Each structure stands twice: as structure tokens, then as C-alpha cells.
Amino acid sequence: METFLFTSESVNEGHPDKLCDQVSDAILDACLEQDPESKVACETCTKTNMVMVFGEITTKATVDYEKIVRDTCRGIGFTSADVGLDADHCKVLVNIEQQSPDIAQGVHGHLTKKPEEIGAGDQGHMFGYATDETPELMPLTHVWATKLGAKLTEVRKNKTCPWLRPDGKTQVTVEYRNDNGAMIPLRVHTILISTQHDETVTNDQIAQDLKEHVIKPVVPAEYLDENTIFHLNPSGRFVIGGPHGDAGLTGRKIIIDTYGGWGAHGGGAFSGKDPTKVDRSGAYIVRQAAKSVVASGLARRCIVQVSYAIGVAEPLSVFVDTYKTGTIPDKDILTLIKENFDFRPGMMSINLDLLRGGNFRYQKTAAYGHFGRDDPDFTWETVKVLNPQA
């Protein structure tokens, strides 16, 4: 039997790039909560003792950017300089301007256009992917890497492992078999966890706790065998972390945000962008389309691409590939997708309820993946049943 290895990684919410994603989306939430028509393109960067937010925001909302930055960092666990950042005493820099009027008139005609006429905020192409290898219809390597990262945070915050600090990374390698285009996971080849820790804990304690409290609850025992390799803090020491260890920037973790290297990616990041930015809304609706194809039993694996021109409402192209796993021809699946999904930006915002912010709606997406999440706020995970015409 011919097999292959595939690897996906994740980082948890204390990673500096992910801190930036969460700050950008917390600001988006605050703007949309008060003004659903807000136009937001918010970037964040961070390094030792400093967080800066910058970009273009046009909104009627009253937003305290500095408070959002500090609250977000504090919520992650950055409460003192020795863990990587002190939320209450770090420098917060804000350099935010209004959206360019050239972009504004081309995209939304200064809010005079009907929803179906609103043009895409930029050019670009986005991909959605789904696979039947997990209940979430997501790649297993990505699901486990992501869940290991989330579990690391959980056992840090509930004090199961009090020696943990906020920053951390995970990586999972799985041995697969290709079943005529469908992916069949066989076993875990390697699990890698690198987590920030305090000065007191030993490497033996780290390895023991990670196996017992992080890996065991996430990865089913039947996928682990005597040949599974564990690299648990292989560098030996990871005390300095967060923005103190590495600079962070919004939009640096786009594969972790999506499918862990499976499928494809058009290159556009998500966080800090309102729904007129098709980098985000376009990627969300093609995930819904691909997931619906697989959930409806039309294919075991599916990728969907959509592309846009700035200021133009209708997509330039829609593409589908089922990797030869389709129960009907791909061209018929494409017809079904076009009949059931409206790819115009204004309509995506309405149909997926993307103008609703606040209550951590977008901030939640900014750590542990935008897809495969069981949460009603992740409206793009709702399956539409697709019935081919007899």
C-alpha cells in the first residue's frame, strides 16, 4: 500500500502574529458593532513593549483603539514583561486614517449602491476547501494541530499546567493513503509542540504534562503507535516569548487560518478587514460552497476558487475541482454552486450576516482557524444541501 506524509502547523493565541490578528479583529468588531457599514482595513504590529495599530478606517463608531489593544493583550495573558508583554504598561501607537475616496467611490459609491451592486473592495482570488476525512470536513492534520494549540491555551488559563506562558506552536504529521482522490488518515507520524514556559519547570515535566494534558485529550490513542515521534520543546528552552521573542504582524498566518497547507490559497489575509474586502468574504463563501458539496455527498473532497476585480460586483470566474471524487461531473457541480451561492460582495455580507460585529464575533476567528468551527457566529460553516437535477 502506497502512503505519504503530510504536515500542518498551528500557533496559539499568544504567538505575536496571532496577537496582531486578534487586535485587528477586535477593532473590526468594535467598529461593526456600532456601525455595520464601517470600512475597516486595520493592521497591527508588535515588538518588545509596543503595539501599533495602523491602516484605514471609515466609521461612525466611537472607538477607543488603545483600550481595545490593552484589553485584547490582557485577555490573551500578556500581563507582565516577563511573559512577553505587559498589556497595561506597554506603548500603544495609533496611526489610522480614512479609506481612500478613490477606493470608496469605486466600491460602494459612497453608500448609494444597492447591496447587489456593491463592487469588490479589491482584485484577487480566493479558495475554499473541504474533505470528508473529519466530521468538520477539514483536513485532519490541520484540525489536530489547531486543537493542540487551543488545548495548550486551555490548560494554561485553567492552571492545569501553571508553568505555561502564552506563546506556543504545534505541528502534526500524519501518514495518509490516497483512495482515488480521497484522503484516508492512517496514523500519526510526528507530533511537535514548542511552548513558552516559566523559569521553574524542567524539560521532563514539560514533556510529561504535554503528553498527559494536551496530546492525550486531542489525538485519539488509536492513531498513535510505538513509532510515533514526539518532539516536545525540542529546542530545550523557550522562556522568552510573545512580542519580546519575535516581532508580530497581522496577516502572517494565512495557512494556519485556513486549511493547513491543503487545498490552495490566494494570498489574502483575513483579520482586520470588513466584509467588502473579498479576501475575507470571498474565502468564507467558497468554504461554504466546498463544504456543502462534500456534505451533500456530491464529492469526498472539493476545492472552489472565485476571483474578483475592484469595483465589480459579479465574480470574474468560479472554478471547482473534486479531485476525481465527484459523484456527478464537476461541470454539473459548478452549475449547482452558481445556482445556490451568490458571490457578489454585498449579497455575501447579507447572506452570511457578515456586517454583524461585536461580542468577539470576528476576534474569535483570529485564533484557532476560521473554518471547521462549531459556533453559530461562523455562518459560513452552515451547509446548504445541494440536490442535482434528475
Curated annotation (Swiss-Prot):
Transmembrane annotation, as ranges: none
Domain of life of the native organism: Eukaryota
Enzyme Commission no: 2.5.1.6
Residues annotated as binding L-methionine: E56, Q99, D246, K277
Gene3D superfamilies on file: 3.30.300.10
Pathway: Amino-acid biosynthesis; S-adenosyl-L-methionine biosynthesis; S-adenosyl-L-methionine from L-methionine: step 1/1
Function text: Catalyzes the formation of S-adenosylmethionine from methionine and ATP. The reaction comprises two steps that are both catalyzed by the same enzyme: formation of S-adenosylmethionine (AdoMet) and triphosphate, and subsequent hydrolysis of the triphosphate.
HAMAP family: S_AdoMet_synth1
Name assigned to this protein: S-adenosylmethionine synthase 1
Organism, scientific name: Petunia hybrida (Petunia)
Organism phylogeny: Eukaryota, Viridiplantae, Streptophyta, Embryophyta, Tracheophyta
Gene: SAM1
